[in-house]
């Protein structure tokens, strides 16, 4: 346990604001049914600039800590939990006793397991994808604080549990009526902080100065609590903003091209612990306080471009959606209660996402908006697909991905290999004429190991749209839906 408080981040917020005011796993078998509702990617008119130009607003909603198999492992046609004749064929070894097979988890509060870089390596286990139960057992140390995942319900690991339309009917409805990405991978084999850094910059690093060239690859932290405190102490002593994230974020390219953006933070408690500690006293979270789920205020390009004002409370997003004043690009991050991060309520998270989607659908800009919903990391939950290697940092484990738009294909399952880097690629293609976060061309050279958006493995989210179709009418769902039917595969 590493207790923490919000004191150091609260001071940091003041300083930044002041200085910036200017048994075995069978991963090769497929889940039943084998008939997919998807169609192969094409190179037709939906890929043209004219098609992409119909998108004026991109909204990215990033939830917390769920693997693909834990939410969509029994979804018809998706690459889900291995099964045959309606029965699961996978059973993972425990530290002792019989192996653990997948099972339907009816609980709204789940436990999950460790999800640091070292935990990802154990879960993947050299591509065998059979380390989840053993890793969960080794990471559980009893119920010690309300934030401890072990407090959810008993001490039995639930990492092999899955939900279906009974628990997450709206997510399954979005998949049925819009697009489900069944090969969406976390961009990095790590936890929330590196994942959220990748979400806005396609990299995670440590920097020795405010120069981008001083940054060095780091996916395990990249900053410990002691280091964060040193940043604050240095900032107070010198009256300057702390040196922190000096590599280039996507906001730099957007600002150069006069493309509007907003990063919206829900006020409440942070979803997880600093340094991926097992337990902590959850500190407050708000848009004024830089942190794991609010990293952009610590980017030097955001500070130097005078863009701190673009980091706002989530209420500003809702007002903008209602008034027809959405920025071109929006990111939205939840507080603990709506994050779905164990042991937070799955239902509460789904309701929160549904309300955000409904806000856009009720507004005048629905007809020109693409909404992407995903989860920042796998949370220790089982997934059977070994992540592809794109560089030394990832990809990480598979997470769910949903695409909701008036131009989204209906009932389409996208089998392309994707990661959250694909969101940046889509933004760049829609608003920046395909410019990438490339040190050779973006004017802020940093030593990132790879231009992630140009990775040959990475698919293209444009394939999820049909720009020849008329914009689809809004499909507003109840945030408190009735449970859906059980899946056809027995657990």
Q: Across the structure, where does each feature detected by a protein language model lie?
A:
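Secretory targeting and sorting signals
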Residues: 2-27
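N-terminal pro-sequences and low-complexity stem/linker regions of secreted or lumenal proteins
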Residues: 23-491
